[in-house]
């Protein structure tokens, strides 16, 4: 029977360590083995498969029955060896067996470190916790003999010690990370950030450049980025150039700057007005200059601008020239506004010479004290001389109408006697006609007196002949008077037509 038993049940091989594969194996839905918890733990990466060990005796090499394997529910997991820490061999823990079993805990979230880790983990589990390389490397280091020699209580103590050291390690790692961040904090604050605290950097760069150069001459360091910051150097140089240019251009005129000083400045206006008064001292009188200099203390912008332009304006004044008209030695008797017409023989019509001021002047003769008169007429505006004739005894004068007078006078253009027509108001025409008639009669009487004085005393036989001569003279004068009257009638008709 013993031989049959040996043939049916093969001998149990010595315990062998089973390593976890890269790919997780799914548990079958119908499986109800007591190692289901181990399969669930195997799915996560932070689990090392336990070593199946059974008690062996040197006497019997046959395995016990399945009931004995199920009755022994304790399965010992190999300790997780951490590099640099030895497993603690202390007293067995007094915790119950339910707590001695390793319970799956969530991953501990740690703050990201500024520097990348030098060692990278090849793979990770489903819950994000990286696989420990020590798990695969530490298990082969333990031989089956050492595992078999350890008691269950010692193994449980080692597992608990490792669990207690893991949070301590996490805390220590967090503390070290905080210290590293605190150490790197000042370094990052000292580092240059583009556009940050630009005013402080620009203001202090002129003061601290010399000191930094003296300090860094012997031992240059990388903590002073301003020494090599070309942007700040350019800003400092541009600021220096701007200050220099501002000092240089401060004396130049800027439109709209210091308007109150430039416009409403009484001293400046007084200086300008005084200079202008000096230039125009020869032209203006003292009273006018003093009145211009006296300006009110408070004046509006328009008044000040007008005063400034008046003071600075250079007036081109012509020298006063004495006007010589030739009438200085004559006394004016009558002047009137009128129109002057001249009779054209070729066209038999009246041609207007112009309108202006007609003056009747009297002048005493130097020879015998007799009165000499003349008519002078100048155009209005240009004062062009259009009539200048003396009154003589044979001058013909006739009143053509109520507002016109026809006279014979010397023409200034061709120096000949022509017939002129003077048209004016009825009042002026009546005064002019009366004045001319009175002077012509006086001239005629004087001519007659001169002729009588020159004539010798007549003989008694020669008297009839003289009477005949006088009658002949009267006959000669009569036709001339008739012709003059006919011309006067014709002139009246033409005057009415022209007017």
From Swiss-Prot:
Pfam families reported in the protein's UniProt record: Ran_BP1 (PF00638)
Which part of the chain is the RanBD1 domain? 310-450
The principal localisation class reads: cytoplasm
Which stretch carries the motif Nuclear localization signal? 49-57
List-wise, which residues carry N-acetylalanine? 2
Q: Where is this region: Disordered?
A: 1-128, 141-196, 264-303, 447-499
Q: Enumerate composition-biased segments (Acidic residues).
A: 466-476
The record ties this protein, via Gene3D superfamilies, to: Pleckstrin-homology domain (PH domain)/Phosphotyrosine-binding domain (PTB)
PTM N6-acetyllysine: list the residues.
9, 21
Residues that span the membrane, as ranges: none
* Compositional bias of kind Low complexity: 481-499
Modification note: Phosphorylation at Ser-58 promotes its import into the nucleus.
Concerning PROSITE patterns, the annotation shows: RANBD1
Record-linked InterPro entries: PH-like_dom_sf, Ran_bind_dom, RanBP1-like
Please list the residues that carry the modification Phosphoserine. Answer: 32-33, 40, 58, 151, 265, 285, 287, 304, 471
GO BP term (any one): protein export from nucleus
| Nucleus in keyword set | yes
Keyword terms: Acetylation, Cytoplasm, Nucleus, Phosphoprotein, Protein transport, Transport
Q: Biased composition, Polar residues: where in the chain? A: 57-66, 116-128
Write out the annotated subcellular location: Cytoplasm; Nucleus
GO CC annotations, alphabetized = cytoplasm; nucleus
Q: Where is the composition biased (Basic and acidic residues)?
A: 1-10
Which residues carry the post-translational modification Phosphothreonine, per the record? 56
Q: What does this protein do?
A: Acts as a cofactor for XPO1/CRM1-mediated nuclear export, perhaps as export complex scaffolding protein. Bound to XPO1/CRM1, stabilizes the XPO1/CRM1-cargo interaction. In the absence of Ran-bound GTP prevents binding of XPO1/CRM1 to the nuclear pore complex. Binds to CHC1/RCC1 and increases the guanine nucleotide exchange activity of CHC1/RCC1. Recruits XPO1/CRM1 to CHC1/RCC1 in a Ran-dependent manner. Negative regulator of TGF-beta signaling through interaction with the R-SMAD proteins, SMAD2 and SMAD3, and mediating their nuclear export.
Subunit architecture: Interacts with CHC1 in a Ran-stimulated manner. Interacts with XPO1. Interacts (via its C-terminal R domain) with SMAD2 (dephosphorylated form via its MH1 and MH2 domains); the interaction results in the nuclear export of SMAD2 and termination of the TGF-beta signaling. Interacts (via its C-terminal R domain) with SMAD3 (dephosphorylated form via its MH1 domain); the interaction results in the nuclear export of SMAD3 and termination of the TGF-beta signaling.
Its protein name is Ran-binding protein 3
**Record gene name:** RANBP3
